[in-house]
Amino acid sequence: MTQQNFVELKNVTKRFGNNTVIDNLELSIPQGHMVTLLGPSGCGKTTVLRLVAGLEKPSAGKIFIDGEDVTDRSIQQRDICMVFQSYALFPHMSLGENIGYGLKMLGQPKAEIRERVKEALELVDLGGFEDRYVDQISGGQQQRVALARALILKPKVLLFDEPLSNLDANLRRSMREKIRELQQQFNITSLYVTHDQSEAFAVSDAVLVMNKGKIMQIGTPQTLYRQPASEFMASFMGDANIFPATLATDYVEIFQYRLPRPANFTTNRQSVTVGVRPEAITLSRNGNISQRCTISHVAYMGPQYEVTVDWQGQTLLLQINATQLQPDVGDNYYLEIHPFGMFILTEKNSG
């Protein structure tokens, strides 16, 4: 256990009967960092959260928190708090009683509990709400209460189990901002589970993508999007157009279309598979024959169009700014691929 890593899973495997849901997983979370687990349904991300919490015991491997082996400890012995999707508030208690319940169970003086409850409510912008009840507040406010209930205990580790999935889009945006703000303010080491990619990107220092119980890639949101390690990652982290390509010293050639070689293409290989994000392809009325394409589908998305084009026997997906172009099906254009949105895939599809 290194000093900078506050939570570590070492060679952790979890089986349910003959089904291996976590396969020899290695995970390190530095002190004060927020790491998000992301992946398709059934990939094992919630099981990892439950293993860290002590709600499940690993079939093999060790779990460390703050340098201590907690593999065999219960959740009560791990100094951990969880924020659940369902909020898990007591309807027969006031909000103040809900938030202060953990302190009450620890035997803290009533006066101290009242003071800390007031402070916690202020933190989540619910000052003066201590005497209200769960059925008197909105879903977004209930999630703030659940967050305050966790923060008041000042845990070593904070776990989030899809906490925003029951909220509408606008509330999700404001709540993820509040969660990130408070997590950074208190420097709490946190593990977050979600199925929402934009949510994962917004709250995380690092994102860990899982599939079939294994880690596919871990990195900053920018790294995962711009430098995916495999075809699975390229597609999972957003739309991607995948092509075979030839690399020369100063250019990349895709179906006879040559463009400048990106500086980060450092491989010595000549034949590679490249990915191009839809926003890195633009359309114009001028170009070479190798760039000529025909629009086959257009979907208006508000600020942008999602456009499908036929090019060199391939079907490409583009995202076009709606203020710059109004494409129609059947129109002919010349496409341009911009190097900033290109990446080399180093592995075949791992999905």
Curated annotation (Swiss-Prot):
Keyword Iron: yes
One Gene Ontology MF term: ATP hydrolysis activity
Key words of the record: ATP-binding, Cell inner membrane, Cell membrane, Ion transport, Iron, Iron transport, Membrane, Nucleotide-binding, Translocase, Transport
EC number: 7.2.2.7
Reaction(s) the record says it catalyses: Fe(3+)(out) + ATP + H2O = Fe(3+)(in) + ADP + phosphate + H(+)
Membrane topology reported for the UniProt record: Peripheral membrane protein
CDD domains: ABC_Carb_Solutes_like (cd03259)
Binding, ATP: 39-46
ABC transporter domain location: 7-237
Localization (cell): Cell inner membrane
PANTHER family linked to this entry: SPERMIDINE/PUTRESCINE IMPORT ATP-BINDING PROTEIN POTA (PTHR42781), SPERMIDINE_PUTRESCINE IMPORT ATP-BINDING PROTEIN POTA (PTHR42781:SF4)
Protein name per the record: Fe(3+) ions import ATP-binding protein FbpC
Lineage: Bacteria, Pseudomonadati, Pseudomonadota, Gammaproteobacteria, Enterobacterales
Name of the gene this protein is made from: fbpC
